[in-house]
Amino acid sequence: MSGRINVVQGDITRIDTDVIVNAANPSLMGGGGVDGAIHRAAGPSLLAACKVVRQQQGECQPGHAVITEAGDLAAKAVIHTVGPIWRGGHDNEPQLLADAYRNSLELVTANGYNSVAFPAISTGIYGYPKAAAAQIAFETVSDYLTRRPQPKQVYFVCYDEENFLLYQRLLGQYDE
């Protein structure tokens, strides 16, 4: 496990990985936060690809993930996953958040990619408590990686200092 999980602070649209995960909304049509940043950086072809996915299968439900081209991003693909809206933790939010990470990793593996960058899913406008979300992210990704050789590298890309420090602390615990 050591060395396969990395924590960085910065702009996920500038990370050099095969795949960037987008914390999308169910419509897949872009929005605020990381979703808006990824759509702006990728250009109109990402929105066009999302429209095709939406026409084929409708909205993306919480915990689910879909893959599209990456548009103008350096990445080869974007995986759009919808995390849960925090409703106090009694509406299956932990399972849905774990599913968002796991289903994204399954798409990375199924498409033969070696590296993926995750944002802190659901911790923005969806209001998931950051520490709890970070714990679920690490547990889910670590569990996945212990049983599979792919992806070779997973990056947690934290935009803000609070998430960065939470993820750094967890990385230290998982590397021990």
From Swiss-Prot:
Catalytic activity line of the entry: 3''-O-acetyl-ADP-D-ribose + H2O = ADP-D-ribose + acetate + H(+); 2''-O-acetyl-ADP-D-ribose + H2O = ADP-D-ribose + acetate + H(+)
Instruction: Identify the catalytic residues.
Output: D35 (proton acceptor)
Could you tell me which InterPro entries the record lists for this protein?
Macro_dom, Macro_dom-like, O-Ac-ADP-ribose_deAcase
Q: What are the UniProt keywords, alphabetically?
A: Hydrolase
Domain Macro, residue spans? 1-175
UniProt-listed GO biological process terms: purine nucleoside metabolic process
Quote one Gene Ontology molecular function term.
purine nucleoside binding
The similarity comment for this entry is: Belongs to the MacroD-type family. YmdB subfamily.
What interactions and quaternary structure are annotated? Answer: Homodimer. Interacts with RNase III.
* Record's function text: Deacetylates O-acetyl-ADP ribose to yield ADP-ribose and free acetate. Down-regulates ribonuclease 3 (RNase III) activity. Acts by interacting directly with the region of the ribonuclease that is required for dimerization/activation.
The protein here is known as O-acetyl-ADP-ribose deacetylase
Organism of derivation = Cronobacter turicensis (strain DSM 18703 / CCUG 55852 / LMG 23827 / z3032)
Question: Which gene name belongs to this protein?
Answer: ymdB
